[in-house]
């Protein structure tokens, strides 16, 4: 029997998008794993990394946009920062219900926004956010490695205030890249991510990264590399 990591996350041509919104959000009993349509969406071992992303997105205070709620790991950390408002886009029905239950208990105002970011983001005004954290799950084999670029190019730059910060991840993609193509995570980011950030309008001198050591559990299907990279991308 093959190891869990040997099973591809997406089959050729697979597209989960039509079924994703209404698919059950399967949180395990210990609340350590979230799966949707059998996909490993989030696992609690990611917590230190999610906290680093949250710290980046909330570093300017003000109004923060989070795309993807998941297990509320990053969202709960954002709430610890001195922010004013916390806008969160989430498309899955079950995850959104968890967001609705979570929101009233938070220190800072939460604005839950239901739907795919592709539908919600175009309705948001330019220059509205001091920080953005984009961490959604790829919904098709076609967009496995590229979905974040669609958001970054079409929305992230315009939604940020001048001086605002974008951070994001695509662990499902980056885990595969670090397994199959790269041994240096900073070079991976430089070669596969920076060109899209430049195309979106960010300047090279405003693109920084921080690397942390974090060893995933052996049974994690989507990430095995013992480091994680946090982008810190400022709108000049």
UniProtKB/Swiss-Prot annotation:
Q: What is its EC number?
A: 2.1.1.2
Q: Which residues bind S-adenosyl-L-methionine?
A: 20, 50, 69-74, 90-92, 117-118, 135
Name the domain of life this protein comes from.
Answer: Eukaryota
Enzyme class per UniProt? transferase
Q: What is the effect of changing residue 156 to D?
A: Disrupts enzymatic activity
N-acetylserine: residues carrying this PTM:
2
The effect of residue 146 to R is:
No effect on enzymatic activity
Which Gene3D superfamilies would you find in this protein's record? Vaccinia Virus protein VP39 (3.40.50.150)
Q: How does it assemble?
A: Monomer.
Q: Which disease is it linked to?
A: Cerebral creatine deficiency syndrome 2: An autosomal recessive disorder characterized by developmental delay and regression, intellectual disability, severe disturbance of expressive and cognitive speech, intractable seizures, movement disturbances, severe depletion of creatine and phosphocreatine in the brain, and accumulation of guanidinoacetic acid in brain and body fluids.
Mutating residue 169 to Y has which effect? In CCDS2; retains no significant activity
Alphabetically ordered keywords of this record: Acetylation, Disease variant, Methyltransferase, S-adenosyl-L-methionine, Transferase
| Resulting phenotype, residue 54 to P | In CCDS2; loss of activity
User: Where, in this chain's numbering, is guanidinoacetate bound?
Assistant: 42, 46, 135, 171-172
What's the stated role of this polypeptide?
Converts guanidinoacetate to creatine, using S-adenosylmethionine as the methyl donor. Important in nervous system development.
Q: Does the keyword Methyltransferase apply?
A: yes
Summarizing the annotation, the consequence of altering residue 208 to P is: In CCDS2; retains no significant activity
Describe what happens upon changing residue 76 to L. Answer: No effect on enzymatic activity
Catalytic reaction annotation: guanidinoacetate + S-adenosyl-L-methionine = creatine + S-adenosyl-L-homocysteine + H(+)
One GO-annotated biological process of the protein:
muscle contraction
Result of altering residue 27 to H: No effect on activity
Recorded source organism is Homo sapiens (Human)
Q: Where is the RMT2 domain?
A: 13-236
Q: GO terms for molecular function, please?
A: guanidinoacetate N-methyltransferase activity; methyltransferase activity
Which protein, by its recorded name, is this?
Guanidinoacetate N-methyltransferase
Q: What is the effect of changing residue 44 to L?
A: No effect on enzymatic activity
* A single cellular component GO annotation: cytoplasm
């Amino acid at each position: 029997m093959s190891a869990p990591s040997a099973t591809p996350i997406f089959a050729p041509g697979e597209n989960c998008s039509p079924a994703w919104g209404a698919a059950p959000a399967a949180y395990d009993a210990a609340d350590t794993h979230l799966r949707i349509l059998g996909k490993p969406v989030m696992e609690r071992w990611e917590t230190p990394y999610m906290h680093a992303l949250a710290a980046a997105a909330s570093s300017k205070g003000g109004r923060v946009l989070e795309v993807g709620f998941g297990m509320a790991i990053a969202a709960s950390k954002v709430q610890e920062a001195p922010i004013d408002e916390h806008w969160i886009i989430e498309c899955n029905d079950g995850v959104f219900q968890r967001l609705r239950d979570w929101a009233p208990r938070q220190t800072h105002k939460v604005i839950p926004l239901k739907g795919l970011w592709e539908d919600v983001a175009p309705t948001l005004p330019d220059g509205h956010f001091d920080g953005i954290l984009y961490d959604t799950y790829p919904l098709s084999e076609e967009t496995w490695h590229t979905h974040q670029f669609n958001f970054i190019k079409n929305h992230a730059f315009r939604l940020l205030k001048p001086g605002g910060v974008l951070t994001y991840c695509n662990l499902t993609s980056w885990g595969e890249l670090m397994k199959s193509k790269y041994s240096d995570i900073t070079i991976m980011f430089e070669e596969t991510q920076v060109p899209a950030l430049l195309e979106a309008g960010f300047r090279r001198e405003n693109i920084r990264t921080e690397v942390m050591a974090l060893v995933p559990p052996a049974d994690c299907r989507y990430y095995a590399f013992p480091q994680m990279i946090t982008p810190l991308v400022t709108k000049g």
